[in-house]
Amino acid sequence: MKAEQQATTDLRIVGDLTVLRSKIMDDAEADYSWRVDPELAGLDATRPVTLTFIEYMRHHRDDVNYPSLWSVRIAIDTLDGRHIGNCMYYDINPDKSQCEFGIMIGDREYWGRGYGTDVVKSALKHIFTSTRIKRVYL
């Protein structure tokens, strides 16, 4: 699994509407604004983040610099480079060849326009063709 994780540090998957790429430090400001939003937190079945932006930046820096072996965090951009959300596959279980998948289109301008569908198709294709994962659940 470790080699699989290392390969994701330069991830770039181009779909019909979106580009999935590795997370970078420049994503922090938009990510923070989405994570503190009560409506988005509710849609993600969680609570809004209560950290200050500085505290959040520390966690974000660690996530970018020291990725977990058990999760892969991915930025979602439009084809013209606008960061509109994130997705991840996590709870990676090598013994069962399975993981969980989550997605959030944080930028409301892109809701209901097919971007989420494009992300799911692109991400699942990547997962099933580039990893040993055989089952993905939501």
Which residues are covered by each model-predicted region?
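Conserved acetyl-CoA-binding loop-helix of GNAT-fold acetyltransferases
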Residues: 112-126
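Short flexible/disordered coil segments
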Residues: 107-112, 137-138
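GNAT-family acyltransferases
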Residues: 1-109
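Surface-exposed alpha-helical segments enriched in charged/polar residues
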Residues: 61-62, 125, 129
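Residue-level detector of family-conserved "landmark" positions at structurally sensitive sites
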Residues: 45, 120, 137-138
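Conserved GNAT acetyl-CoA-binding A-motif
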Residues: 129-138
